[in-house]
Amino acid sequence: MMNNKPDQTDEFELYDLKVVVESIEGNCTCNMTEGDHFFLKGGKLSFPCEQDFCLYALQSAIPLLPAKQRQCHPADWIETDSRCVCPDPACRLTMRIDRIAKRQLKHDDVSPVSWDDVNCKV
């Protein structure tokens, strides 16, 4: 009997990220300072103890983070570009997204859809 199931593993890699305030060239009304940062590990954000982070700066980085967690084609802009800015034009805050480590994850640990169910349909 032939097995038509593809030989696929349920494991995948994501980069852990550190998002760092690289520069502030204007007036930051949220009192951010160069070096302020947060981490993204798997699907969880973490902030250093007692450190605040501007909501508006955070929201400008968030759409980029899932793509930066994944290895893309070397020519893809997400592989070469690592900066984003706060949307407040008076602030002129620039953040840098650094890949700091790779994390191994399993599909069933991060999804309510069973890998076995998905893999049977392929």
Predicted regions: what is each one?
Residues D36-D76:
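Acidic, aromatic-enriched beta-alpha/helix-loop junctions
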Residues Y15-L17, D36, L93:
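Structural beta-strand/beta-sheet cores of well-ordered domains, especially the beta-sheet scaffolds
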Residues C72-K121:
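Short, compact, well-ordered microdomains
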